[in-house]
Amino acid sequence: MDTKAVGVSKDTAASMEASTVFPGFKFSPTDVELISYYLKRKMDGLERSVEVIPDLEIYNFEPWDLPDKSIVKSDSEWFFFCARGKKYPHGSQNRRATKMGYWKATGKERDVKSGSEVIGTKRTLVFHIGRAPKGERTDWIMHEYCVKGVSLDDAMVVCRVRRNKEYNSGTSQKAPKPNSSAEKHAKVQNGATSSGSPSDWDNLVDFYLAGESGEKLLAEMAESSENLQVDNDEDFFADILRDEIINLDEAVMTGNTPNEVPTLESASMEIRVLPLPNMIDKQMSSLLEERPSQKKKGKDATESLSSCFVGLYSIKSVNKARWDVIIGVVALIAMLFYLE
């Protein structure tokens, strides 16, 4: 290693060379160490003790050029001393622009504490390509450290430059959940999650369901469930209707006609009238009343039976699978009319 080229002593150069030869050696000082040791010693003129971090006008270079300027070679982070840029003549912002873009401060300046004592501040900046305010964000990040009580204008700062490899053109940096939203929603409907306690995802689902969109979704689910229940009821009514038609056939043969419409007692102990259309009641009653007198023959009887068929086909609540039984019963009644 050319120690003159990098401007460091032989001891420092030997240490840096060892860090590149032996796996596990890494220069990664903490926030407190950067301020309390490196930055303070730099400001006190103790250059030899901090020569591992070079002086560099960061804003004269693009961020992708900075790794080559670092004394300690690394794949993840690089450190530099730099004078904080002067403010613009008529503004409060520091000059942090390069030829191709600018460093934009994000969030508030935060205190750095050593124990309970505040020893400095830390500010985070993100590099954007282009010019404000339409710059395009990149994956280059810089943390700027300053000693407490020092004038901000032209103050010496130490910078930690990093590249966020997980960042991808402004998209989410986190991998998607292993389970889809449909599976998660099913788990919420069935009860608690596998861990037994509500997760952040469950809380998010609850928050969504509490909103207007969630209420609409729940209403649609309730309607679907209600429709399913109606279909089951229709099958049940169809069975009862089939039994009652058979009973009507027996009543015809014995000469006893029913005077009451059959009823159904629901699970809630409420009495409900079966959904027999009025047209069917009238046509069937007419046939039963006219059958003993045998006044209608031939064409008239055929018309009556035809109207009864039309009425039967108008019953929407009867399951299609039961039509074979109903048609058979009506055919039997028709045969009785013609045989007698």
Curated annotation (Swiss-Prot):
In residue numbers, the region (Disordered) covers 167-198
Give the compositionally biased regions (Polar residues).
167-181
Residue ranges of the annotated DNA-binding region, renumbered to this chain = 119-170
What subcellular locations does the record give? Cytoplasm; Nucleus
Q: Where are the transmembrane segments?
A: none
Annotated GO MF terms: DNA-binding transcription factor activity; transcription cis-regulatory region binding
Coiled coil ranges: none
**What InterPro entries does this protein map onto?**
NAC-dom, NAC_dom_sf
Give the UniProt entry's GO cellular component terms.
endoplasmic reticulum; nucleus
Q: Which UniProt keywords apply?
A: Cytoplasm, DNA-binding, Nucleus, Transcription, Transcription regulation
In terms of one coarse class, where is the protein primarily found? Answer: cytoplasm
Per the record, the GO terms for biological process are: negative regulation of flower development; plant-type hypersensitive response; positive regulation of DNA-templated transcription; response to endoplasmic reticulum stress
Domain NAC spans what residues?
A: 21-164
Its biological purpose = Transcription factor involved in plant cell division.
Subunit and partners: Interacts with PAS1.
Q: What is recorded about the domains?
A: The NAC domain includes a DNA-binding domain and a dimerization domain.
Stated name of the protein:
NAC domain-containing protein 89
